[in-house]
């Protein structure tokens, strides 16, 4: 992802507090200080051991639901069972729906109870990341939860959401976050 998905953004995530009762636009000096601890250069892997430089922390929120969905899908597959797993923006279609593909709707960011598209899938995951569910507004500016590890601010682009279809929900999570 060339750093676009960076699990070391935990200090920034905590600083912004988006989705919590403490959400705020942090002071630039606080963002600058947090950025000193962000980046995979602060992660050192040796065999089964992972060490972080001082102040660095890991936030697996960008892939945790995908990991959980994959584990649940494996349980269903091992039991030779069909089912639809829905974990927020992570949907895993295991097998078929009475012999037919599962029809998965992609939510409309402007009207989340409506859909903008539908895909027919089986044994695949459909993962959507977007800036339209976890955000706050301050002084007329909208701040969402997907943070840019280079700037320390929410990603700025013209996208409201990205959906990825693949055989791994964890991979879909990482890719959809990266593409945002």
Could you describe each region identified by the protein language model?
Residues 1-180:
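Mature catalytic core of soluble alpha/beta enzymes
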